[in-house]
């Protein structure tokens, strides 16, 4: 019951709010760049997987965006780096 009241008063937990905000952002990007939200999410997950092999990153703060300007689309990524991993052959 308290959960319902908190949601009605706009006090839903930050996790749900962040997830909803991310989903909305993906939908808006889809509209601007004609790319499905699933495609952009898969791209983001693949970037995280590859970068994680070389660096320690803050996945919570990672932002991947498509910017559409006139006749071009740019992939813009803001990836906070916590540290670098040592190469296996060093």
From Swiss-Prot:
Keyword set includes Cell membrane: no
Record-annotated disulphide pairs: none
Gene3D superfamilies in UniProt: Cell division topological specificity factor MinE (3.30.1070.10)
Keyword Ligase annotated: no
Native source organism of the sequence: Syntrophomonas wolfei subsp. wolfei (strain DSM 2245B / Goettingen)
NCBIfam families with a match to the protein in the record: minE (TIGR01215)
Name of the protein in its database record: Cell division topological specificity factor 2
Gene that encodes the chain: minE2
GO BP: cell division; regulation of division septum assembly
Keywords of the record: Cell cycle, Cell division
InterPro entries per record: MinE, MinE_sf
General function of this protein: Prevents the cell division inhibition by proteins MinC and MinD at internal division sites while permitting inhibition at polar sites. This ensures cell division at the proper site by restricting the formation of a division septum at the midpoint of the long axis of the cell.
Family affiliation: Belongs to the MinE family.
Pfam families in UniProt: MinE (PF03776)
